[in-house]
């Protein structure tokens, strides 16, 4: 669905090094790929290049079999929905409902289908009760939900989330991440998320680590979390279940290799307790 080949980019020619230096990777159709790394590693730059908001110095970006060029940028943007960390710049409607409907009106969708999509999108993100509210009167987390709803209603082939859940509380973030996964499954949407959130990473199929503008690794979330203390050097926290698993292993209470999810850890503990 997305193929990146030998991408190089710097914001100005005075930079001594590239922001992205010979980056190559691909995203499969219907896949959820998370991109992680320290601030300044090139994560958001990658998202903006794919969305045609920046122009690479060299390399290729291919979206759905079509190379991104000046001639194709608008066709490719039509396939991509992007949600950024600060959603205020994305609001255009007087009410939440109007804002979510804005893109659909521009596409000329029939009224009944437009109403159906708006209601479905707002329900997905838990904002139906706020449909008549002015976006400016919402909290930061609520604004992010509405911004995501506006993109979901358009049903793009690709959803790019650039720290889009960062302003939500932990419970709200988990609910929204699950909603995005439900949407991905329902519509076969490809998801690319720029994130530091471990729950978001855990939901993805694969994780790409950027380090100083280069691809450090591409792996499954389980393989990444198994790296333990290395995660801190990559700009991530160590999952609670990984810390607890290591402590229990050190005390001889469980016997396992690699990373355990919280569910797997509970199962290991039940197995241990049943033998006491």
Curated annotation (Swiss-Prot):
A Pfam family: ABC_tran
Gene: ecfA1
Known partners and oligomeric status: Forms a stable energy-coupling factor (ECF) transporter complex composed of 2 membrane-embedded substrate-binding proteins (S component), 2 ATP-binding proteins (A component) and 2 transmembrane proteins (T component).
SMART domains xrefs: AAA
Keyword Isomerase: no
Subcellular location: Cell membrane
Residue sites binding ATP per the record: 37-44
Name of the protein described by the UniProt record: Energy-coupling factor transporter ATP-binding protein EcfA1
Family designation: Belongs to the ABC transporter superfamily. Energy-coupling factor EcfA family.
Domain ABC transporter, residue spans: 2-237
Chief subcellular location: membrane
Top-level lineage group: Bacteria
Upper lineage: Bacteria, Bacillati, Bacillota, Bacilli, Lactobacillales
GO molecular function: ATP binding; ATP hydrolysis activity; ATPase-coupled transmembrane transporter activity
NAD in keyword set: no
EC number: 7.-.-.-
Cellular component terms per the entry's GO annotation: ATP-binding cassette (ABC) transporter complex
First-tier enzyme category under EC: translocase
Keywords for the protein's UniProt record, in alphabetical order: ATP-binding, Cell membrane, Membrane, Nucleotide-binding, Translocase, Transport
UniProt membrane topology term: Peripheral membrane protein
Function summary: ATP-binding (A) component of a common energy-coupling factor (ECF) ABC-transporter complex. Unlike classic ABC transporters this ECF transporter provides the energy necessary to transport a number of different substrates.
